[in-house]
Curated annotation (Swiss-Prot):
GO aspect biological process, one term: CDP-diacylglycerol biosynthetic process
Residue ranges of the motif HXXXXD motif: 96-101
Domain commentary: The HXXXXD motif is essential for acyltransferase activity and may constitute the binding site for the phosphate moiety of the glycerol-3-phosphate.
Class of the enzyme per the UniProt entry, highest EC level: transferase
This protein's name: 1-acyl-sn-glycerol-3-phosphate acyltransferase gamma
Topology in the lipid bilayer: Multi-pass membrane protein
Keyword field: Acyltransferase, Endoplasmic reticulum, Lipid biosynthesis, Lipid metabolism, Membrane, Nucleus, Phospholipid biosynthesis, Phospholipid metabolism, Transferase, Transmembrane, Transmembrane helix
Nucleus among keywords: yes
Family statement: Belongs to the 1-acyl-sn-glycerol-3-phosphate acyltransferase family.
Tissues in which the UniProt entry reports expression: Widely expressed. Mainly expressed in testis, kidney and liver (at protein level).
Keyword Lyase in annotation: no
Catalytic reaction equation(s): a 1-acyl-sn-glycero-3-phosphate + an acyl-CoA = a 1,2-diacyl-sn-glycero-3-phosphate + CoA; pentadecanoyl-CoA + 1-(9Z-octadecenoyl)-sn-glycero-3-phosphate = 1-(9Z)-octadecenoyl-2-pentadecanoyl-sn-glycero-3-phosphate + CoA; heptadecanoyl-CoA + 1-(9Z-octadecenoyl)-sn-glycero-3-phosphate = 1-(9Z)-octadecenoyl-2-heptadecanoyl-sn-glycero-3-phosphate + CoA; 1-(9Z-octadecenoyl)-sn-glycero-3-phosphate + octadecanoyl-CoA = 1-(9Z-octadecenoyl)-2-octadecanoyl-sn-glycero-3-phosphate + CoA
Length: 376
C-alpha cells in the first residue's frame, strides 16, 4: 500500500476533510445570508453569486469522487446529446438505487459547468440538515413534504420562480420518490398491479405528480428532459464512506434526451409517458445486467481541476490556523483544555458521520413503506 492509499484510510485525515467541509460550509452559508440584501436590488445578481457560493461547497464533495477516490464516470449516449450539455435548461430524471447517485449526477453537472446552478425537488426534512439544507434554501430549491395535497401550491410557486433563472440549470427529479429497497419495491409493485401497470424489476413505480407539475410549470423555460439510468460495473454498491476511504468505482450512465415539445402537455398523457419511460429504464438495466454495458457511444468527459483547486484553497486557509491552535492546546499542558478539545473532536466526528448518514440507504426515509405499515 502506497503512502497516499494509506492516508485515505486514516480517521484523522477524514476528520480534517470533514473539518474543511463543515467550516467552509458555515462560512459560505453566512455569506449567503448576507447576500439576501441583494434580492430586492438585483435578483439576477443574487442568484449568480449564490450559484458560485454553492459551487464552492458542492465541488468539495465532487472532488472526493473525482480526485480522492478517482471514480470514473462513463456516459452512454450520442454526440448530438452531448453537444447540448451545459447549454440549456433541463429536467433530469435519475434512478434512485445508490447512495452516491446524487454525487454521480453532480460530477456530470461540474464537468459541463452547471454544478452551482443545479436544482432538485427535495424532501422537506433536508431543509433542516446543516450546510446541505441551508445552502439549498439560498439556491431556491423546491422542498416538498411528499403529500401532494399540502405540496401542490408550494411546489408550483417554487417552480414558477425558476422560470427566469439566469444560469443554465439541471433540475433533478427522483420520480420514484425514495431510494430503492426490496421492501419498498415489493409494496410498489403491489400498487402497480392494483393499477394495471406493468411490473418493474429494477425501479419503484414512478410518482407522476412532481414530474407532470414540473413539466407544466417549466414549459417555455426547460428545453428538454434528460433521462439518466445509472449503474456500476462489477455489481458494486458504492457508498459515501467508501469514497472517503478512497475506493474507486466505475459508474456508467445511459443518457437520453427528449425535447420538451415531445412530452404531452396534458397531465394524464404526461403521466403515461413517464410510466413508459420507466419501463424503458427497466429494460436498460436488464441489458446492463446481461451485457455489462448500456447501448450507445461511450463518452468520458475529462475531470476539471477546479474542484481540487477549490478544496486546496479552503484547506490552506482553514488548516493552518487549526494546526496552530492544536499545538497551542497541547503545549499549554492544561488537562481541562486538552479534554475539552478532545470532546470537541468527538462531537465534530459525530456530526460529520451524521451528515454522511443522510446518504445511507439503511438510514433513509420510510417513505414508500407506509402502505406496509397500514397492513400491519
Amino acid at each position: 500500500m502506497g503512502l497516499l492509499a494509506y492516508l485515505k484510510t486514516q480517521f484523522v485525515v477524514h476528520l480534517l476533510i470533514g473539518f474543511v467541509f463543515v467550516v467552509s460550509g458555515l462560512i459560505i452559508n453566512f455569506t449567503q445570508l448576507c447576500t439576501l440584501a441583494l434580492w430586492p436590488i438585483s435578483k439576477h445578481l443574487y442568484r449568480r453569486i449564490n450559484c458560485r457560493l454553492a459551487y464552492s461547497l458542492w465541488s468539495q464533495l465532487v472532488m472526493l469522487l473525482e480526485w480522492w477516490s478517482c471514480t470514473e464516470c462513463t456516459l452512454f449516449t450520442d454526440q448530438a446529446t452531448v453537444d447540448h450539455f451545459g447549454k440549456e435548461h433541463v429536467v433530469v430524471i435519475l434512478n434512485h438505487n445508490f447512495e452516491i447517485d446524487f454525487l454521480c449526477g453532480w460530477t456530470m453537472c461540474e464537468r459541463f459547468g452547471v454544478l452551482g446552478s443545479s436544482k432538485v425537488l427535495a424532501k422537506r426534512e433536508l431543509l433542516c440538515v446543516p450546510l446541505i439544507g441551508w445552502t439549498w434554501y439560498f439556491l431556491e430549491i423546491v422542498f416538498c413534504k411528499r403529500k401532494w395535497e399540502e405540496d401542490r401550491d408550494t411546489v408550483i410557486e417554487g417552480l414558477r420562480r425558476l422560470a427566469d433563472y439566469p444560469e443554465y440549470m439541471w433540475f433533478l427529479l427522483y420520480c420514484e420518490g425514495t431510494r430503492f429497497t426490496e421492501t419498498k419495491h415489493r409494496i410498489s409493485m403491489e400498487v402497480a398491479a392494483s393499477k394495471g401497470l406493468p411490473p418493474l424489476k429494477y425501479h419503484l413505480l414512478p410518482r407522476t405528480k412532481g414530474f407532470t407539475t414540473a413539466v407544466q410549470c417549466l414549459r417555455g423555460t426547460v428545453a428538454a428532459i434528460y433521462d439518466v439510468t445509472l449503474n456500476f460495473r462489477g455489481n458494486k454498491n458504492p457508498s459515501l464512506l467508501g469514497i472517503l476511504y478512497g475506493k474507486k468505482y466505475e459508474a456508467d450512465m445511459c443518457v437520453r434526451r427528449f425535447p420538451l415539445e415531445d412530452i404531452p402537455a396534458d397531465e394524464t398523457s404526461a403521466a403515461q409517458w413517464l410510466h413508459k419511460l420507466y419501463q424503458e429504464k427497466d429494460a436498460l438495466q436488464e441489458m446492463y445486467k446481461q451485457k455489462g454495458v448500456f447501448p450507445g457511444e461511450q463518452f468520458k468527459p475529462a475531470r476539471r481541476p477546479w474542484t481540487l483547486l477549490n478544496f486546496l484553497c479552503w484547506a490552506t486557509i482553514l488548516l493552518s490556523p487549526l494546526f496552530s491552535f492544536v499545538l497551542g492546546v497541547f503545549a499549554s499542558g492544561s488537562p481541562l483544555l486538552i479534554l475539552t478539545f478532545l470532546g470537541f473532536v468527538g462531537a465534530a466526528s459525530f456530526g460529520v458521520r451524521r451528515l454522511i448518514g443522510v446518504t445511507e440507504i439503511e438510514k433513509g426515509s420510510s417513505y414508500g413503506n407506509q402502505e406496509l405499515k397500514k397492513k400491519e
